[in-house]
């Protein structure tokens, strides 16, 4: 029970990074997004510097914040349809590229965001870092 979307789980350990939000149904503020992106990069860079093959799940808007690693955008943050559509394929791609750990940005749980976060949370085994 509760693992209906276990097939989304990549072989690598996935950590989801999300801002501490009182209202998860709200969209993230620009400040929250920037704080989250900064933490994803900090965590990823520590692993990259240690010689680990790191995957990073980001959005089109934050792609430039990640100069190293196996970086994959799953679409524009405002286009939840494309993010939802691309999620499974990106997770499988990290398997093909032999990522050892993956860090992912999170999404507000408005509209399709709730389904996206549900799948990401389950794929991460509920390993979440809140910033």
Describe each model-derived feature in a short phrase.
Residues 2-125, 129:
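A C-terminal functional module that forms or caps the active site or interfaces directly
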